[in-house]
């Protein structure tokens, strides 16, 4: 999802999927005004006749032409602003390749002619929005999950861990286990239906084995969902089985630690002196941390991993779906931030590599 708006606002004005759709077939009716590409919600609503592409994979931009289309759509159709009149703050994944940061900077200054630009790490902004400058952020979105330890406002690069398991993988896994129940979803359009089922009905079990046992003995957790064609499907233990993969990536055939173990591993990579503050400030952010029960389960798992004397505290703010954006809104409206921007003049003098000197 792309979230866009104005500094100082308490929520983004525009939230739309970061997708670009192109017609599968050439339009046969002349004058129908079929465009060669559609972005965001419009691509979503016309998905039946389009091929959808995601320019961002695992949090990192892979297709710059499509990304440019998304930014163009953001400025002109969603926010309705002239980019040359507004400084722009973009967010990036931790460990974003250097060339990617330069490319973002170049497109903003050369294609969109912005007067000033800045790029910040998503997790750091989430922490700001929770009113902290020290803590460890578990940020899980659609394409990637990161655990980022932050001390006094600076991320600790040696402790940053990335897990290539996030919302999109859970949607795919839910598609798979629903097909075992006899409901088949295959196309990119049907995947969106499954994503909706996931967002509305899935939750995290506090004790997976216990929940499996309970669900096999009673139908209390079964819920029904009406598909767009009117067919009603029933979903039972899939509600928590799909999301369990966050804690047990082996369910997806991934040889990786779950979000609990990854958070613990990240803390262990940090200096002894800061661990206590990290354990006491574990902040969740991103849409994939929105499942009911996730904070309680994290509390239970991290407490079991941590030394017994440690006080573990999980912070899961209700607005965490947008906390990266909110942190950006706060940062960009601070008077002290105004000297941080990369100006058009600085860019013209130094070129794209200036981003490494001014944004860290």
Curated annotation (Swiss-Prot):
According to its UniProt entry, what is the function of this protein?
Actins are highly conserved proteins that are involved in various types of cell motility and are ubiquitously expressed in all eukaryotic cells.
Keywords, comma-separated and alphabetical: ATP-binding, Cytoplasm, Cytoskeleton, Hydrolase, Nucleotide-binding
Write out the GO MF terms.
ATP binding; hydrolase activity
Catalysed reactions, semicolon-separated: ATP + H2O = ADP + phosphate + H(+)
Residues annotated as transmembrane? none
PANTHER family for this protein: ACTIN
InterPro entries tied to this protein: Actin, Actin/actin-like_CS, Actin_CS, ATPase_NBD
What is the protein name stated in its UniProt record? Actin
